[in-house]
Swiss-Prot record:
Residues that hold heme c 4 according to the record: 86, 107, 110-111
UniProt xrefs under PROSITE patterns: MULTIHEME_CYTC (PS51008)
PANTHER family referenced in this protein's UniProt entry, alphabetically: FAD-DEPENDENT OXIDOREDUCTASE 2 FAD BINDING DOMAIN-CONTAINING PROTEIN (PTHR43400:SF7), FUMARATE REDUCTASE (PTHR43400)
MF GO annotations: FMN binding; metal ion binding; oxidoreductase activity
pH effect on activity, per entry: Optimum pH is 7.4 for fumarate reduction.
Flavoprotein-like: annotated span: 143-596
Gene that this sequence comes from: fccA
Protein name, as recorded: Fumarate reductase (cytochrome)
Active site: 427
Enzyme class: oxidoreductase
Phylogenetic classification of the source organism: Bacteria, Pseudomonadati, Pseudomonadota, Gammaproteobacteria, Alteromonadales
Keyword Metal-binding belongs to the record: yes
Regulation: Mesaconic acid is a competitive inhibitor of fumarate reduction.
Signal peptide coordinates: 1-25
Binding site for heme c 3: 83, 93, 96-97, 386
């Protein structure tokens, strides 16, 4: 097939789209392409779609236009490049581009940039809920009356950090696994995590002479969660956190940098060298290892109903593919790793009315499907009222700014140019403090020394959300901050750094003075970030009912579960949670399958 330069293609699209009556007038990409290609240029010879992941169709896109990396070279923008994706895995062309209907830019589900994609419409997530899908009685009954489409040992629902960890762990324990994902991209919320992976008494800490222990991590986690956490689950998290770091490292992860996150007594947030975002890196490593193991990954496929026999034992799961429709998979065990519900503001607001209308830092699939599936299977929910806001979501562009920026030395100031909080306090306290300021927002202020300490910051600068100036007065004028007061505030902060003690707000770490090179400001406001409540599990990741009885063959891991974090999650504990309990769920599900 002749390879078409994408820059030429886009120029043609932009120059002709909407000019009805011309040779290339079209309402969608299929109409545009058919004037230069035949239908079988995209589709299989029989005219059918290859699968729900659209594997063949995406291969055809690449054969014509090139890989995502190649396309990115021809679509550069001053601040952002939609094709230079920060997503891990192999991002499919059809994640954004549709053929026979209007396309939607997946980036718009989180960001507020103008990507101006040809033949596109405004982003809209309008999928039926699990309850609404129950109305598809005839289709569901027909699928269940048929023979199982597949027979495996374990089905994992959700391809975030917990799901991939579970799938790999189960596979390595001898199980045959199918991993399903309802979104067109992998990674869940894990791919967006930037701060670090908390773990205690690791080799990486020892190399930096950091004294830590599982007991101290346990204490910090319980305190951060207001002692509402399930102590047994927290003990699993803290005592196995080192093993999780070792497991990821053995698979190729770089977790050599160790920083501090809010609520931690010592530096225990592990991340790549130079302070790069941990989430996308971890998910990429997990994805690569899943590919090596030939794990069956099915995109655009929703887990709909856990199927049980007359004794209440799991026998499989009903799924719905975007194109294949309903079918069921026979399996001894099902692992729910579907994440939380922070993107579902209707659900969030019912549980915490104070968060009504808040935007969220989460990926669009985090609406609570797994909770509904678990409840319908008899699983109990706990701690649902505890919902966390992340304090630093950029007002411009909707970018979540990692806590590590504060951990590495940035300060928070209000429009009056004054500090108002210990910058690395727990997220609930920092969020409340920001909302109490003028305009319900604040500014992260830092210099080039902080920027150089954390490579993730260059991404924010590149996205245009971190204006810069060579003086604090100029920066203040640019951002509407009192420049004189800001200058005095930074001078005061630098004096506290020199003294080694923050007598103003009792910030426990003062890593560096802010006096090198240029200064930067990011306006931030809290956004709904993490839902601490979820499915009740035991220390084997087994889902339990309201009587705390195990549902045989049903497991849960990650943000879909409740009990680990209590009333408030500490930064850095999410990645540790999903890897630790994902591994555990996979191992236990594989063991269970062998016995049954």
């Amino acid at each position: 097939m002749k390879k078409m330069n994408l820059a030429v293609c886009i120029a043609t699209l932009m120059g002709t789209a909407g000019l009805m009556g011309t040779a290339v007038a079209a309402d969608n990409l299929a109409e545009f392409h058919v004037q230069n290609q035949e239908c079988d240029s995209c589709h299989t010879p029989d005219g059918e779609l290859s699968n729900d992941s659209l594997t063949y169709e995406n291969t055809q896109c690449v054969s014509c236009h090139g890989t995502l990396a190649e396309v990115a070279e021809t679509t550069k923008h001053e601040h952002y490049n939609a094709h230079a994706s920060h997503f891990p895995g192999e991002v499919a062309c059809t994640s954004c581009h549709s053929a026979h209907e209007k396309s939607m830019v997946y980036c718009d589900s989180c960001h507020s940039f103008d990507f101006n994609m040809p033949y596109a419409k405004k982003w809209l997530r309008d999928e039926p809920t699990i309850a609404e899908l129950a109305k598809d009685k005839s289709e569901r009954q027909a699928a269940l009356a048929s023979a199982p489409h597949d027979t495996v040992d374990v089905v994992v629902v959700g391809s975030g950090g917990a799901g991939f960890s579970a799938a790999i762990s189960a596979t390595d324990s001898g199980a045959k696994v199918i991993l399903i994902e309802k979104e067109p991209v992998i990674g869940g919320n894990a791919k967006l995590a930037a701060g670090g992976m908390n773990a205690a008494w690791t080799d990486q800490q020892k190399a930096k002479k950091i004294t830590d222990s599982p007991e101290l991590m346990f204490e910090d986690t319980m305190k951060g969660g207001q002692n509402i956490n399930d102590p047994a689950l927290v003990k699993v998290l803290s005592s196995h956190s080192k093993d999780s770091v070792d497991w990821m490292t053995a698979m190729g992860a770089d977790l050599t940098d160790v920083g501090m996150m809010g609520g931690a007594s010592v530096n225990r947030a592990h991340r790549p060298t130079g302070g790069a975002g941990v989430g996308a890196h971890v998910v990429q490593v997990l994805y690569d290892n899943a590919v090596k193991r030939n794990i069956d990954l099915r995109m655009n496929t929703r887990g709909i109903e856990v199927l049980k026999d007359d004794k209440g034992t799991v026998k499989g799961i009903l799924v719905k593919g975007m194109y294949k429709g309903y079918y069921w998979v026979k399996a001894d065990a099902v692992i729910l790793a579907t994440g939380g519900f922070a993107k579902n503001n209707e659900r969030v607001a019912k549980l915490d009315p104070s968060l009504k209308g808040f935007i969220s830092t989460n990926q669009p699939g985090a609406v609570g499907d797994g909770l509904d599936v678990a409840e319908n299977a008899g699983g109990a929910l706990k701690d649902m009222q505890y919902i966390q806001a992340h304090p630093t979501l950029s007002v411009k562009g909707g970018v979540m700014v990692t806590e590590a920026v504060r951990g590495n030395g940035a300060i928070l100031v209000n429009r009056e140019g004054k500090r108002f909080v210990n910058e690395i306090t727990t997220r609930d306290k920092a969020s409340a403090a920001i909302l109490a300021q003028t305009g319900k927002s604040a500014y992260l202020i830092f210099d080039d020394s902080v920027r150089k300490s954390l490579s993730k910051i260059d991404k924010y600068i590149g996205l245009g959300v971190a204006p810069t100036a060579d003086s604090l007065v100029k920066l203040g004028k640019m951002e509407g901050i009192d420049g004189k007061a800001l200058t005095e505030t930074v001078a005061r902060y630098n004096s506290l750094v020199s003294s080694g003690k923050d007598t103003d707000f009792e910030r426990p770490n003062l890593p560096r003075a802010l006096n090198e090179g240029n200064y930067y400001a990011i306006e931030v406001t809290p956004g709904v970030h993490h839902t601490m409540g979820g499915v009740m599990i035991d220390t084997k990741a087994e889902v339990m009912n309201a009587k705390k009885q195990v549902i045989p063959g049903l497991y849960g891991a990650g943000e879909v579960t409740g009990g680990v974090h209590g009333a408030n999650r500490l930064g850095g504990n999410a990645i540790s949670d999903i890897i630790t309990f994902g591994r555990l769920a996979g191992e236990e599900a594989a063991k269970y399958s062998k016995k049954n």
